[in-house]
A protein has these predicted regions:
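Glycine-rich, basic loop-to-helix element that forms the pyrophosphate-binding segment
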Residues: 61-77
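A conserved acidic beta->alpha catalytic loop
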Residues: 35-46
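Cell-envelope/extracellular polymer assembly enzymes that use nucleotide-activated donors
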Residues: 1-2, 21, 33, 171
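Donor-binding/catalytic cores of nucleotide-activated saccharide
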Residues: 6, 66-67, 86-184, 194-210
Length: 267
């Protein structure tokens, strides 16, 4: 498994905790590859990374955004499977081990799991599947974040993240899903998502939110352009996802232009 960790402005303690959560898994050095893509951070964490493991692949590049940082990681990935992790998050060992067992013992292209805002998580149930990614999208609400997916590298082909935008996951993830022929999914919470003030998804600057909405609109346009070229089943799945994202966009526009307390009361 190639673990692609993107790093920009996260506190070093969080990055080290992230890497340690990968090292804690039941994978030996030949079964894992840890890639840290430094997207132009003010301080290089290379010394701290070497102290954790001498086998970490570290690359530092000028700030180009999360999408391009992940693309860099993809080009360096040597594992059969890929797992993306943001540098301030971490994997929850017991639940993630279930995902590893699935790729070890079953023929699968992708394992979907849940995220948690708590660091402790225990496996709750067996995974369901296999089904196709198309079938999953047709009957389930898809989480945008690609970080809750462990997937086979070869299904990517030429698929990459869009560069220089927010909402890069919303464009990338549904296209990735359509490429998965054998998918397992579980409600187990294997990914700890840290809600941190100052992180990219918790900014309060109005200009940032306006840019976020503009980028989301462009993502919708680009996904819609691809629909006409898809086979019938894939088209139905993608149209359902576009409808979900459109409703999210409408809600977020209303939130930005109206009083949020009043909006939540009405809803």
């Amino acid at each position: 498994v190639s673990f692609i960790v993107t790093y920009y402005s996260e506190p070093l303690d969080m990055l080290k905790e992230c890497i340690s959560s990968i090292l804690a898994l039941s994978l030996n050095e030949t079964e894992r590859q840890i890639i840290v893509v430094d997207d132009g951070a003010d301080y290089s964490p290379i010394n701290e990374l070497i102290a954790l493991s001498s086998n970490i692949v570290y690359v530092r590049q000028p700030n180009q955004g999360l999408g391009q940082a992940r693309n860099t990681g993809i080009e360096l990935a040597e594992g059969s499977f890929i797992q993306f992790i943001d540098g301030d998050d971490l994997l929850l060992t017991s639940a993630y081990e279930q995902c590893l067992d699935i790729i070890r013992y079953r023929e699968t292209d992708m394992v979907l799991f849940q995220s948690s805002d708590k660091k402790s998580s225990k496996p709750l149930a067996d995974a369901e599947g296999p089904i196709s990614g198309t079938e999953y999208m047709t009957h389930n609400n898809l989480r945008g974040s690609v970080c809750t997916a462990l997937f086979r590298k070869e299904i990517l082909h030429d698929l990459r993240f869009p560069k220089g935008i927010l909402h890069e996951d919303e464009e990338f993830t549904p296209q990735l899903m359509l490429r998965a022929e054998n998918l397992y999914f579980t409600n187990n919470k294997a990914y700890y998502y840290r809600k941190r003030e100052g992180s990219i998804m918790h900014k309060r600057d109005k200009r940032w939110h306006i840019r976020r909405l503009a980028d989301a609109e462009q993502v919708l346009y680009r996904l819609k352009e691809r629909v006409d070229y898809l086979p019938v089943k894939e088209r139905i799945a993608m149209e359902r996802r576009i409808a979900q994202l459109t409703m999210d966009q409408i809600y977020n526009v209303i939130r930005l232009t109206h009083n949020e307390t009043h909006l939540n009361h009405v809803l």
